[in-house]
Amino acid sequence: MKTILAVETSCDETAVAIVNSEKQVLAQEILSQTEHKKRGGVIPEIASRAHMEHLSSLIKNSIEKSNLNFCNLDATAATSGPGLIGGLIVGTMMAKAIAHVTQKPFIAVNHLEAHVLVIRLLYEVKFPFLVLLISGGHCQFLIAQNVGKYIKLGETLDDSLGEAFDKVARMLGLSYPGGPLIEKLAKKGNGTRFKLPRAMRKRPGCNFSFSGIKTAVKNLVQELEMSEQDVCDVCASFQECISEILLDRVKNAVIMAESLNIKINDFVVTGGVAANNFLRKKLKKHINLNILFPPINLCTDNAVMVGWTGIEILQKDYIDSLNFAPRPRWELGSY
């Protein structure tokens, strides 16, 4: 049995977890930074300072809750990219320091791969499987062939889906982060009132574009008085639009996988936007695949997914040097 202490500091969550190869989460700690809410978005310098301030205490708490000590660890892991470079440096250097002192391996984890592989902590998902990764920084279709081996089928040509949610929320006068607020207000809205553009829909391939939707919402905000009901209707119409785009793109992704002679049994939807229950229900209803979502708390950034990915990497004997440098940009599959 292997046990890993994992650190996640790629954006505005400071998180630590201890996970073992028996799929047990022995401890998990997470601190969400609230400072960014009043500023309308994540301020990188503030985020990295908060990581420096809180990371040590979260590690201490995790060790105590797990009833282990550092000598019981088989490795340390940290999200080392992609993400905000300041936070990546804080987390990576801390994990390296523990690895050096304990003379145990250090594993640099790709944040995107952690989102993809966490599903294998929860379910018996075998490679290959289809992935829709929708988060604050990324929006792409992948075929996960193995640990460290991925085929990218399509991606956003402009904003990520998470960015689109946040920018639309800002136009509507909602606070950051926008996704949960849009979902909440949409429940009181009419999703058929506004016909927003379904960009790329019915086109071949499975790339995305969300810039036209943002422009359409901006025009609505300028045209309407934006009563409380107007805001709710825009939120509902926006979510309805996004769901139709995703459904169209999923069908194309399956066709592309089949053209590569890859049989897909499982379809995994992951990343922060996968926490949206409206989108979950739409995909479950209309997609004829075994569709799997991580629980809400493992869709958003967390260290459990980093720890489990570290376990998967360790089992493949992919060990990183202590000279590994954090990568603010890091494509999947590029070890």
UniProtKB/Swiss-Prot annotation:
Gene that encodes it: tsaD
Residue numbers binding Fe cation: H111, H115, D301
Organism in which the protein naturally occurs: Wolbachia sp. subsp. Brugia malayi (strain TRS)
Main location: cytoplasm
UniProt-listed CDD domains: ASKHA_NBD_TsaD_bac
Any single GO CC term annotated in Swiss-Prot or TrEMBL for this entry: cytoplasm
Protein name stated in the entry: tRNA N6-adenosine threonylcarbamoyltransferase
GO molecular function, one term: N(6)-L-threonylcarbamoyladenine synthase activity
Cofactor binding note of this UniProt entry: Binds 1 Fe(2+) ion per subunit.
UniProt KW Acyltransferase keyword: yes
Cofactor: Fe(2+)
Function of the protein: Required for the formation of a threonylcarbamoyl group on adenosine at position 37 (t(6)A37) in tRNAs that read codons beginning with adenine. Is involved in the transfer of the threonylcarbamoyl moiety of threonylcarbamoyl-AMP (TC-AMP) to the N6 group of A37, together with TsaE and TsaB. TsaD likely plays a direct catalytic role in this reaction.
Entry's family note: Belongs to the KAE1 / TsaD family.
GO biological process, one term: tRNA threonylcarbamoyladenosine modification
Binding-site residues, substrate: L133, I134, S135, G136, G137, D166, G179, N276
Enzyme class (EC, first level): transferase
Enzyme Commission number(s) from the entry: 2.3.1.234
Catalysed reaction, written as an equation: L-threonylcarbamoyladenylate + adenosine(37) in tRNA = N(6)-L-threonylcarbamoyladenosine(37) in tRNA + AMP + H(+)
Subcellular location(s) per record: Cytoplasm
Annotated keywords: Acyltransferase, Cytoplasm, Iron, Metal-binding, Transferase, tRNA processing
NCBIfam families per record: gcp_kae1, T6A_TsaD_YgjD
